[in-house]
């Protein structure tokens, strides 16, 4: 990133599906002091371009899977100076793999903390960028997300975290990055599928996961025989947020998985978090 002329405090945009390279890009930005904005892949070209221009991105990283959208936003994002594309390339985009192969493997001498600047959903107008200074709080502070993951959710080197949601959302991205900083293994689904989710839990002996209530509903709609096909006894924490969970749905999940369900309320702005677990009710 520094080789492209980006310096600490500059902005870049990440427009990717749940791709294996997603986090190497985010962690690279963090170590170089870059502020990165992950963007929903479900937006229209004009909506995507608005966020890219508004956040002041000098670099855009995308993938061949999103080539059509990436091509459409080129004329709408004149401030972008560099465009990298993973798994292939189109006109106006440099191949990410070729660019990476030319980079040095030694750490940069002046590593500076960067961070994310995510955008609101735009329900009251244009989406709004939420900038949180990278050093407030420190990543390992007890009140940081990483601190909460360690002290309340028990993340550690033996943990396996399953993330079934789009990584451009705040919770999936930030929880995965916190888990990896704590030495945990992260298993990331390309997209949520109820039966595939259960199979991943069994195959990878997943200990932690985070879902939204609609995912609970879809799993509960599976035939009982299909739900019992997979061993989910490794699960220790099932964390959910994003929307209130109907009481009957939560009760059915607890009957199935046991008293491991945690609910939290928080916001992209990082102003605080409220945690609720069954044993405290």
What do these predicted regions represent?
Residues 3-4, 27, 31-102, 107-110:
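Structural core segment of the AMP-binding/adenylate-forming
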Residues 116-118, 181, 206-211, 222-281:
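Gly/Ser/Thr-rich phosphate-binding loop
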């Amino acid at each position: 990133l520094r080789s492209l002329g980006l310096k600490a405090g500059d902005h870049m945009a990440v427009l990717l599906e749940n791709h294996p390279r997603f986090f190497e890009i985010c962690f690279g930005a963090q170590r170089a002091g870059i502020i990165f904005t992950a963007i929903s892949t479900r937006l229209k070209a004009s909506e995507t371009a608005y966020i890219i221009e508004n956040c002041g991105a000098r670099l855009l990283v995308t993938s061949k899977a999103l080539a059509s959208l990436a091509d459409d936003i080129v004329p709408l994002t004149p401030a972008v100076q560099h465009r990298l594309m993973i798994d292939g390339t189109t006109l106006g985009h440099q191949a990410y793999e070729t660019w990476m192969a030319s980079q040095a493997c030694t750490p940069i001498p002046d590593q500076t903390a960067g961070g994310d600047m995510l955008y609101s959903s735009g329900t009251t107008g244009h989406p709004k960028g939420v900038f949180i200074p990278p050093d407030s709080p420190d990543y390992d502070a007890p009140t940081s997300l990483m601190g909460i993951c360690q002290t309340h959710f028990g993340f550690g080197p033996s943990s396996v975290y399953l993330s079934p949601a789009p990584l451009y959302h705040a919770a999936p991205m930030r929880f995965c990055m916190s888990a990896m900083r704590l030495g945990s293994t992260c298993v990331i689904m390309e997209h949520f599928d109820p039966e595939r989710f259960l199979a991943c839990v069994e195959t990878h002996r997943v200990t932690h996961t985070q879902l939204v209530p609609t995912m609970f509903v879809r799993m509960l709609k599976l035939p009982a025989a299909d739900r019992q096909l997979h061993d989910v006894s490794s699960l220790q924490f099932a964390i959910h947020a994003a929307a209130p969970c109907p009481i009957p749905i939560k009760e059915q999940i607890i009957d199935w998985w046991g008293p491991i369900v945690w609910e939290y309320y928080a916001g992209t702005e990082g102003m605080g978090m409220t945690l609720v677990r069954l044993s405290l009710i």
